[in-house]
């Protein structure tokens, strides 16, 4: 039996754990602290699948009809 991957579904946008350097750049660009980002629970199925842990920041890349590609950021919490 093959394992089902949430990330392969057409309705699920790309999720990835942000490298520290890229995260610092984004936080600086928006003049915010990591704790001010929107949150996502560590028990979220996609967080489990990508191996995110509490304190990581997940970058979500969505396809947008108006913007082309749009990036969103979420802080992983308990």
Swiss-Prot record:
It catalyses: RNA(n) + a ribonucleoside 5'-triphosphate = RNA(n+1) + diphosphate. Keywords: Cytoplasm, DNA-directed RNA polymerase, Nucleotidyltransferase, Transcription, Transferase. GO terms for cellular component: cytoplasm; DNA-directed RNA polymerase complex. DNA-dependent RNA polymerase (RNAP) catalyzes the transcription of DNA into RNA using the four ribonucleoside triphosphates as substrates. The lineage of its organism: Archaea, Methanobacteriati, Methanobacteriota, Stenosarchaea group, Methanomicrobia. The keyword Transcription applies. Its EC number is 2.7.7.6. It is an enzyme of class 2 (transferase). This is DNA-directed RNA polymerase subunit Rpo5. It comes from Methanosarcina barkeri (strain Fusaro / DSM 804). Belongs to the archaeal Rpo5/eukaryotic RPB5 RNA polymerase subunit family. PROSITE patterns: RNA_POL_H_23KD. GO terms for biological process: transcription by RNA polymerase II; transcription elongation by RNA polymerase I; tRNA transcription by RNA polymerase III. The keyword Repeat does not apply. It comes from the Archaea. Part of the RNA polymerase complex. GO terms for molecular function: DNA binding; DNA-directed RNA polymerase activity. Pfam families: RNA_pol_Rpb5_C.
């Amino acid at each position: 039996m093959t394992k089902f991957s949430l990330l392969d579904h057409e309705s699920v946008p790309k999720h990835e754990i942000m490298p520290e350097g890229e995260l610092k750049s984004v936080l600086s660009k928006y003049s915010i602290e990591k704790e001010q980002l929107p949150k996502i629970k560590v028990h979220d199925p996609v967080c489990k699948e990508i191996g995110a842990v509490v304190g990581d920041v997940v970058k979500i890349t969505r396809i947008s009809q108006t913007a082309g590609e749009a990036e969103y950021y979420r802080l992983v919490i308990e």
